[in-house]
């Protein structure tokens, strides 16, 4: 079945979802409450699913409604972004949509973003945190202009820039943990410990290359997407976390690097098949200059 649902219908539905109340959403949309209710009912009839559970004071999204809300946001954002890119001439304006993993090596990227939004008041930035899989998915469907990923050298489907500084792998432990007394952590030190690791790293070969056959002796007790949440579990003293240097600060924990040293590169990537906006082109140009300046200063 091909739906006749349009962008306005998605905008109306998403406003209802965010407001949690049809009457409130109607006021914000400047339409009547009965008209908005009919719009939602027509969407449900057309799609053949229930989107909302209507309570006395607040509506709740069904599973189908939550899916439509999430994808609707992406579609609306992509539409606005497309209109902006098509209508611009030589002006530098609009939103830079950037997806990024966690790394302190991103400081030069943030410096360039700050320069652009400071120099061009009509620009802004939307930074989405996520792992490589999410970032590539959003790049491919046009929801992001750029992605910043770590540790993956297979970039054949994307344009890319290598960000100069690397990420240093190590272990986050509590200050009273025996491992905190060590200067570096070897694979032998991690045997018989409960280890937390990022979901992305768990599915890559980098750690296996470092640990060799001893990787099978390690106990991975949990996975995470954001280290700040995993840090709370580390602070209980029951687990340690494999992570990058410098991502978390805590009065209860310390970071110890792995030995032999293990590093990941950082890459800025963008889609081969999508034309960049003016602000996107400026972003790449400024980054190239910034990276070249940093490299020159190191010699």
Kindly give the residue locations of the regions a language model identified.
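Short helix-boundary/capping micro-motifs
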Residues: 14-32
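Short beta-strand-centered segments that line the small-molecule binding cleft or hinge
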Residues: 2-4, 70, 111-115, 132-169, ...
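Central regulatory/effector-binding core of bacterial HTH transcription factors
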Residues: 93-155, 215, 223-226
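A late-sequence structural motif
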Residues: 108, 257-299
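Secondary-structure junction motif
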Residues: 193-215, 276-284, 294, 298-299
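Hydrophobic hinge/microswitch elements
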Residues: 131-144, 149-150, 201-254
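Beta-alpha-beta core module
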Residues: 156-162, 166-168, 225-275
């Amino acid at each position: 079945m091909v739906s006749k649902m349009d962008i306005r219908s998605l905008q109306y539905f998403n406003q209802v979802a965010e407001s949690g109340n049809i009457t409130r959403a109607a006021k914000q949309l400047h339409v009547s409450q009965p008209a908005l209710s009919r719009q939602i009912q027509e969407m449900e009839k057309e799609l053949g699913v229930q989107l909302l559970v209507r309570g006395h004071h607040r509506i709740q999204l069904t599973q189908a409604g939550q899916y439509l809300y999430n994808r609707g946001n992406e579609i609306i954002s992509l539409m606005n972004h497309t209109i902006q890119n098509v209508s611009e001439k030589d002006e530098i304006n609009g939103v830079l949509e950037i997806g990024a993993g966690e790394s302190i090596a991103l400081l030069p990227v943030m410096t360039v973003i700050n320069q652009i939004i400071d120099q061009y008041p009509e620009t802004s930035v939307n930074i989405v945190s996520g792992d490589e899989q999410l970032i590539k998915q959003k790049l491919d469907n046009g929801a992001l202009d750029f992605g910043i990923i770590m540790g993956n050298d297979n970039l054949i489907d994307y344009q890319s820039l290598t960000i100069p500084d690397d990420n240093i792998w190590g272990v986050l432990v509590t200050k009273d943990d025996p491992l905190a007394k060590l200067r570096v952590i070897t694979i032998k030190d991690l045997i018989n410990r409960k280890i937390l690791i990022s979901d992305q790293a768990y599915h890559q070969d980098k750690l296996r290359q470092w640990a060799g056959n001893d990787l099978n002796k390690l106990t991975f007790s949990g996975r995470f997407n954001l280290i700040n949440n995993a840090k709370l579990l580390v602070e209980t003293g029951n687990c340690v976390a494999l992570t990058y240097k410098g991502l978390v600060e805590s009065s209860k924990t310390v970071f110890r690097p792995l030995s032999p040293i293990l590093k990941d590169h950082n890459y800025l990537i963008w889609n081969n098949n999508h034309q960049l906006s003016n602000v996107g082109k400026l972003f790449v140009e400024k980054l190239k200059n910034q990276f070249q300046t940093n490299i020159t200063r190191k010699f």
